[in-house]
Amino acid sequence: MSQQVIIFDTTLRDGEQALQASLSAKEKLQIALALERMGVDVMEVGFPVSSPGDFESVQTIARTIKNSRVCALARCVEKDIDVAAQALKVADAFRIHTFIATSPMHIATKLRSTLDEVIERAVYMVKRARNYTDDVEFSCEDAGRTPVDDLARVVEAAINAGARTINIPDTVGYTMPFEFAGIISGLYERVPNIDKAIISVHTHDDLGIAVGNSLAAVHAGARQVEGAMNGIGERAGNCALEEVIMAIKVRKDIINVHTNINHHEIWRTSQTVSQICNMPIPANKAIVGSGAFAHSSGIHQDGVLKNRENYEIMTPESIGLNQIQLNLTSRSGRAAVKHRMEEMGYKDTDYNMGHLYDAFLKLADKKGQVFDYDLEALAFINKQQEEPEHFRLDYFSVQSGSSDIATASVKLACGEEIKAEAANGNGPVDAIYQAINRITGYDVELVKYDLNAKGQGKDALGQVDIVVNHHGRRFHGVGLATDIVESSAKAMVHVLNNIWRAAEVEKELQRKAQNKENNKETV
């Protein structure tokens, strides 16, 4: 029987570093639930010591997730480990992942230390983490540029200290697959207690070979792969988990290992991450790109029609991509919409049926026919905007032309009060944004604007994603409508609600901190 490769997802920790705007706790939980449904073994969900907000989101996910092991990152620093344990302790079981650099360059220039001191610190911190949990992972940062003999010393000491998983990262995406496999093989040859730990790998894509490096390491004996959905991450990104997972499945004949992933959830999880993180998937992206199963060559098309295996090494259905598109109309009842959502793999918790059906009827009245991609877009927006709103778009009107200055009139519900303003702008969208900013008084700077069609044809839904800068922080907003000006207005209102909610969360965190301080003084 083949051995299992543990899938360790770091989309919510390392992957998030690539985003232009930080995710809210609710958005992180949405992604965590999708990852749990896909069956990841371990999910690294944050760096709790970095901020009160990250602490809260790690705690929320740890409290909610039951079928995947929740993990948090900590440097080899006492406070990091203690805070990580505090955030994770609400989980039934959890992992602490601690790390320190081991390469000569990092030790000399970053840590200004010695290898012996690094080993001593690693041992102490692994033991400290073991006081909180028996599931401790230790990473040798920049292992790819660490001499194997040095690496073996660190690994042996960390295992003796109690680390159950040893992670070997190619932190800067520098090594070649044959080199990386050699590092893993070298550790198996040099570390006498290596059988007491699982060897993990964490690769980056700076040279475009993160997946190749991970697979080479698995072939050499690594039994955990770390990565992120869609390969998101800082610089050129992380190892794309969906690619590793499907490579292991498709080429089990030579790799002879398996994962416990539910492959039929890959496509949906990939889409969830892409939409929430506002990171579109390239059409030519392996496994999950829109062109991954497209055949434009006449020869290829003929071959696929005769036998799909002529040019397809896996099927769209194997990753959960249902290519059958059905349409509904305004005469379709609630039960029909719910049934179609179930057929597409959605659970009741993925959307609010009442809100979704209302949005469906409005769209059906406009378009006549509503397709699967419309429903999925509506369900996504429905989930993003289900929280209480302080701002709500009540009305807007725009006048613009090729030689006229665009003018917009906007009515906005601000709490219980309706406010109205008009403004000019450089085009209809800018005019609306100027009017909204006048109403709210929020000082926001638009730094990114994306428009994507959700479907086909002139009546397709248009999704607008924006990122704004507000007092040094970046916030993401999304809007959906068949009218792109309306989508743009909704996106700005969504972003303002996110800013408002962030301020409310900050007030609540300050209140909790003050209460904690008052309790200390009382004692």
Curated annotation (Swiss-Prot):
Q: Has UniProt tagged this entry with the keyword Secreted? A: no
Enzyme class comes to transferase
Catalytically driven reaction(s): 3-methyl-2-oxobutanoate + acetyl-CoA + H2O = (2S)-2-isopropylmalate + CoA + H(+)
The Gene Ontology biological process terms listed for this entry are: L-leucine biosynthetic process
Keyword list (alphabetical) reads: Amino-acid biosynthesis, Branched-chain amino acid biosynthesis, Cytoplasm, Leucine biosynthesis, Manganese, Metal-binding, Transferase
The record's subcellular locations are:
Cytoplasm
Which pairs are disulfide-linked? none
User: Part of which pathway?
Assistant: Amino-acid biosynthesis; L-leucine biosynthesis; L-leucine from 3-methyl-2-oxobutanoate: step 1/4
Q: Region (Regulatory domain) spans which residues?
A: 392-523
Q: A Gene Ontology molecular-function term?
A: 2-isopropylmalate synthase activity
The UniProt record lists the EC number as 2.3.3.13
In terms of Pfam families, this protein maps to: HCS_D2, HMGL-like, LeuA_dimer
Q: Which domain of life is it from?
A: Bacteria
Known cofactor(s)? Mn(2+)
Tell whether Mitochondrion is among the UniProt keywords.
no
Q: Where does Mn(2+) bind?
A: 14, 202, 204, 238
UniProt cross-references to InterPro entries, sorted A to Z: 2-IPM_HCS-like, 2-isopropylmalate_synth_dimer, AIPM/Hcit_synth_CS, Aldolase_TIM, LeuA/HCS_post-cat, LeuA_allosteric_dom_sf, LeuA_bact_synth, PYR_CT
Q: Which family would the database say this protein is a member of?
A: Belongs to the alpha-IPM synthase/homocitrate synthase family. LeuA type 1 subfamily.
How this chain assembles, per its entry, is: Homodimer.
HAMAP family given in the database record: LeuA_type1
List the PANTHER family: 2-ISOPROPYLMALATE SYNTHASE 1, CHLOROPLASTIC-RELATED, HOMOCITRATE SYNTHASE-RELATED
This chain's function reads: Catalyzes the condensation of the acetyl group of acetyl-CoA with 3-methyl-2-oxobutanoate (2-ketoisovalerate) to form 3-carboxy-3-hydroxy-4-methylpentanoate (2-isopropylmalate).
Report the protein name in the record.
Answer: 2-isopropylmalate synthase
Organism source for this protein? Salmonella typhi
Query: What are the leading ranks of the lineage?
Result: Bacteria, Pseudomonadati, Pseudomonadota, Gammaproteobacteria, Enterobacterales
The gene coding this protein: leuA
